[in-house]
Amino acid sequence: RNALSLSVETLAMSVLATAMAGVAVLLTFLPAARNLGNGELGGAPSRLWTVLYYLVRATFTLTRAIPELVWALIIIFFLSPGILPGALALGLHNYGVLGKLSAEVVENLDPRPTRALRAAGSSNFQMLFYGIIPQALPQFLTYMLYRWEVVIRTTVVVGFVSAGGLGREFRLSLSFFHYSEVALIIFWYLILVVGVDLLSAWLRRLARFD
């Protein structure tokens, strides 16, 4: 197959994996912050929040403890080879990593803004959207972009188990001793990595300015 189309496929896999992990973390990382359940940020302590804390934290630990390659080997039994199994494998592992990092961002927040909101009579919803998310979102975006840089490098690993992209073609070329194709794939892979690194750095600067 054309190296350019494989590069686009690899890039799509990395973007899909990062997006899936990011969306899943946005929906679940708040219960994984201990200070939200014990009232340190101004809210009332909640037993339900404590139970959610342990459940979500356990999920983060499980998903990041299993390497991307193992996730890919499991998923490939249920799905046809292609970028979707690779994206799911990468997304699951990075969900655990990004989730832990994001929860720790909330745990390290300055509690004074949320306490001031609570003292002014704000609801939990208002505390969340005016006190917690504005503080945590820039750091979350920074971590997500960093993980994208890691994901684009790991696509070649999951590709070895027929998860699509440059990784799969790299394995096939090595198996048939097509070293000229191997060199071409490495060249395109380096272009992808450098391009994603540069784009990620630019987007991180935008996130910090905001």
Ranges and model annotations:
Residues A44-G91:
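Generic hydrophobic transmembrane alpha-helix motif, especially the helices
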Residues F77, V151-Y189, R208-D210:
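Glycine-rich helix-loop "coupling/hinge" segments at transmembrane-helix boundaries
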Residues S5, E9, Y53-R64, E104-A119, ...:
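Short amphipathic alpha-helical coupling elements at transmembrane boundaries
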Residues I74-F77, P81-I132, P138-R147, L198-A201:
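Membrane-cytosol interface at the C-terminal ends of specific transmembrane alpha-helices
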Residues L26, L30, A72-F77, G86, ...:
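Transmembrane alpha-helix boundary and packing residues in multipass membrane permease domains
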Residues T142, A183-D210:
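C-terminal transmembrane helix and the adjacent membrane-cytosol boundary/short C-terminal tail
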Residues N2-R34, N38:
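Transmembrane alpha-helix signature in integral membrane proteins
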